[in-house]
């Protein structure tokens, strides 16, 4: 028995030694293979060689772009940080500033390519200036990380941003998983640790204040996640809000597409960040929102998450309502901005276009391609906005308002919403004319059928306007006298295309109507003509008949009417 026992032990030992030798040989071969240069050994390896060469050339091109850009700025390139973020096409570099304090010199520069089909006009200098101004305007808020430098390289279609690097804490995701910020992204989030309840409450309230500030200023974000929240000495700073202006896909885009109709995107993103802080890991997929919250989550945080993901009676909760909940309301901050930001019309147009583009991208059920032509363009958005402003003017043609006298020409046009002038012609409906009737309606021409009374009234008014203020007491009697004498002799107006002829003066002959008198050049009325005893000559179609009829008019023949002055105060007799 002992003989067989020794044989078994020797066989096992020999097998173990042989296995160890094989493992060592394989590892040595693997390390030697990695040290060898990338050369094609046979025809089957040509594709692999070309692929590796393209990757190497791409990295060299990225480094060259970074060096060329930083050549004319105040920063100097230090090194490239490999596999720093979750985006494969976004490259990070360590950058040194020129400050005397070494702790302030540590910077992170990010370079990300932008699609050529993205319609926001960043290729022009005016568009880049507007983009920088919008991004820099948020530096007044204490919970927003504003980049030290933000720019766009039109030749390379690459966006550049430089931010301070918080080496102690890093991002909120680094703070949750207790990992080093500069570790490779695939290796530093293996451990899962949940934060303290008080820290979750404090960080959550700080993020809420920043989101409410952006919401009140109609600022597009859509990119909230724990990796885009920086931690600096127990203070959370949201960052990377410029991604929405560059057409980058948000990390939570699948969640937003799934629950876009039920939950606001910013509220949903905040709920996912709160879930990661309280549970220690990121929510896996959009369908996990409808599943019950884990048992190890804090009870107070559970109430907030249920209010976000499972709203009461289907009413979605807002950011302001979340900030008033007991879990966040007891935190008070004194350094919040009190005044609102003001933006120019160009800046507001760019922000509105970014919001519409991102909402269109996130409202589709399937992920659109970068070359998808169904994505709305900036020209279409401007056309829609212009069409919305001109809704009122589509049913009316732009018509200039005409005036008979010189005094009404200055204020004769009334603009509507589209900037067109509205004419009081008979082509418009009568109820529309009643709404836009000017104050001095007798000075404007109407193409509708008028009666002789209105014509005579305008004639008597034009006659009486030639007198001075000394004969104002006889105005009413003159009007009645002219109406009674000319009602039977005036012929009806001749229908003619616009502009219509002026009403004829009172005359006993049935000749053609004389032309209207020229408008006076002075603003005041002319002096009254001297009375004449000669009878007025008959109207022969010339201006002489009208002038002689006006000169023959005498105010001495008018009778003064007795008027009762009721403008004074009423006194009671004792």
Swiss-Prot record:
Q: Which residues are glycosylated?
A: 358, 440, 449, 453, 456, 464, 470, 477, 483
Q: What is its main location?
A: membrane
Start and end residues of each stretch annotated as Disordered: 366-386, 450-574
Annotated TM spans: 6-26
Q: Which GO terms describe its molecular function?
A: actin binding; protein kinase activity
UniProt domain Protein kinase: residue ranges: 166-346
Among its keywords, does the record have Ubl conjugation?
A: no
Bias type Low complexity, positions:
450-493, 546-556
Q: Which InterPro entries match?
A: Kinase-like_dom_sf, WH2_dom
Q: List UniProt keywords, sorted A-Z.
A: Glycoprotein, Membrane, Transmembrane, Transmembrane helix
Q: SUPFAM superfamilies, alphabetically? A: Protein kinase-like (PK-like)
* Compositional bias of kind Pro residues: 494-539
Task: Give membrane topology per the record.
Answer: Single-pass membrane protein
Q: Name one GO cellular component term.
A: membrane
Compartment list: Membrane
Know anything about its domains from the record? Answer: The protein kinase domain is predicted to be catalytically inactive.
What name does the UniProt record give this protein?
Probable inactive serine/threonine-protein kinase slob2
Species per Swiss-Prot/TrEMBL record: Dictyostelium discoideum (Social amoeba)
């Amino acid at each position: 028995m002992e003989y067989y026992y020794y044989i078994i032990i020797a066989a096992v030992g020999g097998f173990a030694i042989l296995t160890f030798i094989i493992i060592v040989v394989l590892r040595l071969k693997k390390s030697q293979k990695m040290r060898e240069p990338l050369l094609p050994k046979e025809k089957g390896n040509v594709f692999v060689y070309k692929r590796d060469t393209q990757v190497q050339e791409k990295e060299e091109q990225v480094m060259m772009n970074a060096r060329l850009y930083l050549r004319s700025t105040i920063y100097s390139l230090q090194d490239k940080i490999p596999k720093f973020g979750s985006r494969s096409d976004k490259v990070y570099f360590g950058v040194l500033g020129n400050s005397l304090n070494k702790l302030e010199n540590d910077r992170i520069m990010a370079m990300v390519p932008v699609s050529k089909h993205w319609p926001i006009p960043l290729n022009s200098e005016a568009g880049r200036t507007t983009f920088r101004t919008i991004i820099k305007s948020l530096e007044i808020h204490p919970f927003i990380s504003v980049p030290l430098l933000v720019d766009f390289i039109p030749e390379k279609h690459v966006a550049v941003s430089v931010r301070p690097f918080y080496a102690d804490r890093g991002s909120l995701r680094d703070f949750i998983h207790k990992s080093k910020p500069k570790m490779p992204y695939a290796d530093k989030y293996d451990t899962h640790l949940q934060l303290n309840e008080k820290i979750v409450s404090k960080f959550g309230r700080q993020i809420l204040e920043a989101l409410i500030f952006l919401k009140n200023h109609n600022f597009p974000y859509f990119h909230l996640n724990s990796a885009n929240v920086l931690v600096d000495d127990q203070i959370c700073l949201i960052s990377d809000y410029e991604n929405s202006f560059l057409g980058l896909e948000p990390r939570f885009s699948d969640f937003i597409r799934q629950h876009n109709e039920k939950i606001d995107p910013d509220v949903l993103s905040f709920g996912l960040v709160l879930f990661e802080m309280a549970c220690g890991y990121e929510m896996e997929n959009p369908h996990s929102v409808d599943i019950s919250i884990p048992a190890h989550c804090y009870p107070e945080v559970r109430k907030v998450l249920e209010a976000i993901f499972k709203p009461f009676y289907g009413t979605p909760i807002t950011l302001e309502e979340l900030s008033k909940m007991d879990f966040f309301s007891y935190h008070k901050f004194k350094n919040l901005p009190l005044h609102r930001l003001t933006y120019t019309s160009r800046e507001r147009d760019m922000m509105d276009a970014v919001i519409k583009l991102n909402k269109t991208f996130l409202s589709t059920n399937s992920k659109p391609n970068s070359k998808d032509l169904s994505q709305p363009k900036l020209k279409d958005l401007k056309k829609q906005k212009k069409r919305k402003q001109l809704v009122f003017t589509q049913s009316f043609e732009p018509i200039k308002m005409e005036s008979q006298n010189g005094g009404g020409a200055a204020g004769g046009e009334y603009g509507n919403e589209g900037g067109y002038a509205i004419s009081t012609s008979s082509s418009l409906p009568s109820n529309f004319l009643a709404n836009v009737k000017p104050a001095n309606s007798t000075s404007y021409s109407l193409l509708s059928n008028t009666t002789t009374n209105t014509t005579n009234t305008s004639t008597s008014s034009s006659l009486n306007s030639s007198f001075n203020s000394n004969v104002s007491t006889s105005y009413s009697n003159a009007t009645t006298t002219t109406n009674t004498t000319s009602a039977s002799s005036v012929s009806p107006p001749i229908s003619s295309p616009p502009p219509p002829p002026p009403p004829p003066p009172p005359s006993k002959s049935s000749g053609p109507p004389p032309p209207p008198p020229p408008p006076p050049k002075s603003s005041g009325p002319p002096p009254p003509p001297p009375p004449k005893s000669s009878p007025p000559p008959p109207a022969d179609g010339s201006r002489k008949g009208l002038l002689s009829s006006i000169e023959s008019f005498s105010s001495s023949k008018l009778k003064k009417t007795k008027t009762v002055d009721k403008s004074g105060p009423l006194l009671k007799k004792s």
